[in-house]
Amino acid sequence: MQKIEFGSTGLVIEKNGFGCLPIQRISETEAVKLLHKACDGGINFFDTARAYSDSEQKVGAAFSGMRDRIVLATKTGAQTAEGFWRDLETSLRTLKTDYIDIYQFHNPAFCPKPGGEDGLYDAALEAKKQGKIRHISITNHRLAVAQEAIDSGLYASLQFPFSYLAGEQELALVEGCRTHGMGFIAMKGMAGGLLRDGLTAAAWMAAQENVVPIWGVQRESELDQFLQCIREGAELTDERRTTIERDRRELCGEFCRGCGYCMPCPAGIEINQCARMSLMLRRAPAQAWLTEEWQAKMHQIEQCRHCGHCMAKCPYGLNTPELLQANYKDYWEVLAQSRK
């Protein structure tokens, strides 16, 4: 096992964490079994959110009798102090705990600070004083907000998208967290499903100092990969380095990460999949994306109004309408080829 001290919190965390967003999609019985297997296999860090429908409920069902074995993180997307307290009390009740180790502001458009009109940070300070949360943290998809959070000295950790496709700016955030005594939680370690080899991703993450990836898991086979890394370690072999370099050549640049912050689309387009369809066609079995259901979803791109809604919401500054049109054109060409 590879355990690290998490920033300046005093918490000791297994280097591989469990991202609890995907357990929304399975039954409570299946989720509890999966969470118990993860914990028994050495994973002790579990990250969920108020926004993840019944994820907190399933985590609470799994760990209410073994709270001292895990480090628990959740999130609030509240915009006001009143909303903060409502979310916190709901999370405590649903998670069946009287405290949360790492309580995170969930992708705010700004960096909450003491004395702010929103009252969010002051509410968090009061919750910490009351013992309901141990550490105040933040998640984000925006480089500017993430950097401001690091520079502020107000946060115990930052959660940010980070994989072996990361560029210099993301790597600078990791280094900034390290020098400021903050933990760094890596979300989207598989780049939103674009990376296919979990062992290669885990091997690369293992070499990143002060980084705790949270792997989004909903199947036992997925969990087994990461438990294997914990048991045996994951060596960054020449073969895996070759895989990383190939993926970097193919995927770095202007591509949709599938985060979904542009949704819902006023024209009903499933942007977080349609805007990266060309990549999915080439990195997963293509036939799964060429069904009548997906053809109908791609046809919906024809209804794009170029209203700018998606561009204004995109944390990566992408020209989403252009991406949609490029993916639309490519999709029908691939479909036509498949029918020959």
Language model segments and positions:
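Active-site mouth loops of central-metabolism enzymes
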Residues: 17-29, 73-85, 109-111
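Short, well-ordered coil/turn segments that N-cap beta-strands
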Residues: 11-16, 42-45, 66-70, 97-101, ...
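Conserved, mostly hydrophobic/aromatic
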Residues: 6, 18, 46, 59, ...
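N-terminal binding-site loop/beta-alpha segment at the start of enzyme catalytic domains
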Residues: 1-70
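Short catalytic-loop micro-motif centered on adjacent basic/acidic residues
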Residues: 44-49, 73-74, 134-137, 157-160, ...
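Structured C-terminal cap/extension of enzyme domains
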Residues: 39, 43-44, 172-186, 190-340
